[in-house]
Amino acid sequence: HPYVTNNNATSAIQNLPQSIIDWMRQKLTKNLNLNDSNFPSKFYIDRGDASPNISKLRQIVNENEVIDKLSKHKFKVIKLSDYSIKDQIKLFFNAKKIVGLHGAGFANVMFSNTDLKMLELKPSGAGKMCENLAKKCNVIYDCISVLPEKFNENNQMGHIRINMKDLQDRI
């Protein structure tokens, strides 16, 4: 990680400097044609492909309900591992609405346009990394923060249940 000043990467990434965000955006988009209508404008980030040590510790208990609700609103379910880095950049650049469980996939928000609406679903102790990044990228950020049903001492973890009315009101 390029910005660890206190020997604690988890703490350091909560608020990345704008210069790092700008540098990443510039370097990784330099020779890309970003406009591409082949990518969905609304999608849900499915973390079913997350490493087993993470996926067993942080899940949406009622994910099938969440996916059903989002599908009715024309959200496509995607796994970021199905896309190259270049295509992930294009995916986020062309997105209008993104919903997903708190996780590293939201780092791609730095490549989004400012009209993106991002909804993060997260355990209540997960921190503000995604929120801070979204705000620095001028993205419209919202979250549903839920007390975990199954809690792990690492505050980013825990299985959460999303209230369908809360989800409906925010999409």
Where are the predicted features?
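The feature primarily captures lumenal catalytic ectodomains
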Residues: 1-171
